[in-house]
Amino acid sequence: MLDIKRIRTDFEAVTEKLATRGVDAAVLNEMKEIDAKRRNILVKVETLKAERNTVSAEIAQAKRNKENTDDKIAAMQNLSAEVKALDAELAEIDAKLTEFTTTLPNIPADSVPVGADEDDNVEVRRWGTPREFDFEPKAHWDLGEDLGILDWERGGKVTGARFLFYKGLGARLERAIYNFMLDEHGKEGYTEVITPYIVNHDSMFGTGQYPKFKEDTFELSDTNFVLIPTAEVPLANYYRDEILDGKDLPIYFTAMSPSFRSEAGSAGRDTRGLIRLHQFHKVEMVKFAKPEESYEELEKMTANAENILQKLNLPYRVVALSTGDMGFSAAKTYDLEVWIPAQNNYREISSCSNTEDFQARRAQIRYRDEADGKVKLLHTLNGSGLAVGRTVAAILENYQNEDGSVTIPEALRPYMGGAEVIKP
């Protein structure tokens, strides 16, 4: 959530920045007018309350003097009625301002490339060289079916489209991947957490999914509960409405969880395979940091995600998202895109974002600065470390052999009971 004071005092700059995210200046102008009206009403209310207090004191004095107070009582009643009417108007204005501030996206950092969409993203670096096959590489969904480790047909029968069963060494591979990821993040100082997989609406508001993106979630009917779209939601809300000690920052959390997404806007996209599912496992990283340290922490978090891909020897590239492609809550985002041979393309496997104080303001997560003792909003960061199903897809395609088998990456073999190959 944006700071109304920042919008008020730096209006032109904020308007210019949000325009790069598709926010019409008319929206901010309307917000500015409503805010000005609110402040004018507040002045009137304070003036009327002061007058009412004066009249109240005069009534008390008149009663002590045994004087008639009818006129003064009538005047005080009129003042109270005016205050009540203005308070009601203020409540309506506050509701409108809240609607504005909770639906506006975060202000992009100065270092974010300006652009309309993903075509304006900027490649930062690449790692590894895509393998040159001397045979036609299969898509991971065909490999999975041929190996008997991925079953979309029965997933569709039991549930519906974009669901599947992992079987045998496929299930073992999925488990090996997320255990490996959690172990690697643990070495980097992350505390492993098992979170609730169901959260309340306040938590969804805190991280920015609600109210704007309700259609993308699975709500439990007639309850205040939602299936988590990512472990970011419970992790980032862990300290909601709390004040932390500044000396304890930064704090690192990691968790593996299922993620549930309706993919409301993705009809017709990635209808086959593991790239876009309604339910998938993901290892998440979340950080709580001081404002002056958060961008250094973003670079570290991105490196932590890269470490997984490097140890799995999967070629990838790092991309800085443009203002038009970033997520709602992000001030800056790096995407990691892994090479998918059958698509001859890089596909997203991780997003690492600094939300600055956007989520912290919504969730009221603060810290007491040990230097001056003041309570301040901290910065939150989140990143995929990594999407597990997409990692399975990348391994199947990059490690496939001409006979249809798939070599298991060396880093995962200790988690696979020493198995080296998945054979048909």
Swiss-Prot record:
Keyword Protein biosynthesis tagged: yes
Protein keywords: Aminoacyl-tRNA synthetase, ATP-binding, Cytoplasm, Ligase, Nucleotide-binding, Protein biosynthesis
Catalytic activity: tRNA(Ser) + L-serine + ATP = L-seryl-tRNA(Ser) + AMP + diphosphate + H(+); tRNA(Sec) + L-serine + ATP = L-seryl-tRNA(Sec) + AMP + diphosphate + H(+)
Record flagged with keyword Cytoplasm: yes
Main location: cytoplasm
Pfam families in the cross-refs: Seryl_tRNA_N, tRNA-synt_2b
Family matches, as CDD domains: SerRS_core (cd00770)
EC nos: 6.1.1.11
Domain of life the protein comes from: Bacteria
Subcellular location: Cytoplasm
Residues where ATP binds: 261-263, 348-351
List of residues binding L-serine: 230-232, 284, 384
UniProt pathway annotation: Aminoacyl-tRNA biosynthesis; selenocysteinyl-tRNA(Sec) biosynthesis; L-seryl-tRNA(Sec) from L-serine and tRNA(Sec): step 1/1
Written domain comment of the UniProt record: Consists of two distinct domains, a catalytic core and a N-terminal extension that is involved in tRNA binding.
Function: Catalyzes the attachment of serine to tRNA(Ser). Is also able to aminoacylate tRNA(Sec) with serine, to form the misacylated tRNA L-seryl-tRNA(Sec), which will be further converted into selenocysteinyl-tRNA(Sec).
Similarity comment text for this entry: Belongs to the class-II aminoacyl-tRNA synthetase family. Type-1 seryl-tRNA synthetase subfamily.
Protein name stated in the entry: Serine--tRNA ligase
Originating species: Streptococcus pneumoniae (strain ATCC 700669 / Spain 23F-1)
